[in-house]
């Protein structure tokens, strides 16, 4: 999705809406992680405005782009984005009930609770590996049914913690080997962890590490919309998976706590929030977003709706047999032969039967 009708000033206001919703929700809950959403708000705003293909009115659209927040502790980033773009599954009341018992807006995003959350991301690095799997699935489906039907990207936001986890190393190696060019990882390179500077815990050169895995790599200022646009555009043109390191300030907009571990995993406090509002030139009451900013965000989803309708027309053009095969593959329903095989046959027979039923199927063994 390309939408270049908005200027940097409008983007800044849209990003600030993410920031104030974040600090208000975390403050109300007296718990949460405001720093990452505040720091990555500019990158996320540009991504959703100009690149991400999505339709809030049909969140299960098969050919939507996938957006995975692997750094799930910064969950207010995705909750704010889904609310602002018009997903009906998340209301302002849910934002106000952030991290409360029984609320959809848990401290870490949970799959199945809110449309638009593609996978549960609690353990760091898990979302990264999930995103690799999603990109593998996209390529296999596209090869079978054609780019007119399956042609989408997978975007994944990660932090330093995700990249420290062993699972990210294994998944990154696999993605590079598979040359998953539709996978774009956005690294929040803020140099801060919960304990302080990341120098205390890690000294990896992440860019060189991902180059060694066979990835396309780039770095940019995460608060410069033109720079963000440039590197994402280059990533979309690459035949390799892309690792984009965005230098950001954790807690961007917070005069006293921004750039420090103090805003990583704790509320900013009432006094600092007032200073943030002043710094961002934001005069609204807590949880109030100006109508003009809401309208700007909601328009993004309207274009996605048009793309989804065009896709539906292409789907209708498939031959009946191919169309039914596509629907069966997406449903991934197992027939009775599979269930019988699970009880009576050895592993290979089970796999062969599942493959004949589902059509698109990955399996691996360690012997």
Give the label of every model feature segment:
Residues 1-154, 295-367:
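Thiamine diphosphate
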Residues 56-57, 113-114, 119-299:
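Glycine-rich ThDP/TPP pyrophosphate-binding loop and its adjacent helix/strand module
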